Curated annotation (Swiss-Prot):
Gene3D superfamilies: Pheromone/general odorant binding protein domain (1.10.238.20). Residues 1-21 form the signal peptide. It comes from Drosophila melanogaster. One of its GO terms (molecular function) is pheromone binding. This is General odorant-binding protein 28a. Disulfide bonds join 38-69, 65-123, 113-132.
Length: 143
């Protein structure tokens, strides 16, 4: 599969995953490993996983919780359900290979999304961050 995982690692590596400057197969493998370990914990289905991989909004609460679990496992969602910008910046550096232009975009996306107001519910927060990541990635021509 040639899709960049995101968002997540939309989802989600604070936009760095959307920059495509890293080993997509390795990133997707890490995302899948994390997601598969989270699925039983949150009651997510294969359909929830496929939505995440395809960078689509979650259609179920379990799908939102799957994203929150993955983001926590990766280290970018903290115990309070907020983006950990310091960890996100480190992930951005790692996944952009420190390419200055790509790193700048990834950090901009991460900082923009970290500044949004999200619900206290961690699952809903993860979905809100994912929506932000997708929107910002589109603005930068990455999706």
């Amino acid at each position: 599969m040639q899709s960049t995982p995101i968002i997540l690692v939309a989802i989600v590596l604070l936009g760095a995953a959307l920059v495509r400057a890293f080993d997509e197969k390795e990133a997707l493998a890490k995302l899948m490993e994390s997601a598969e370990s989270c699925m039983p914990e949150v009651g997510a289905t294969d359909a929830d996983l496929q939505e995440m991989v395809k960078k689509q909004p979650a259609s179920t609460y379990a799908g939102k919780c799957l994203r929150a679990c993955v983001m926590k496992n990766i280290g970018i969602l903290d115990a309070n359900g907020k983006l950990d910008t310091e960890a996100g910046h480190e992930k951005a550096k790692q996944y952009t290979g420190n390419d200055p232009a790509k790193l700048k975009i990834a950090l901009e996306i991460g900082d923009t999304c970290a500044a949004i107001t999200v619900p206290d519910d961690h699952c809903e927060a993860a979905e809100a961050y994912g929506t932000c990541f997708r929107g910002e990635a589109k603005k930068h021509g990455l999706l």
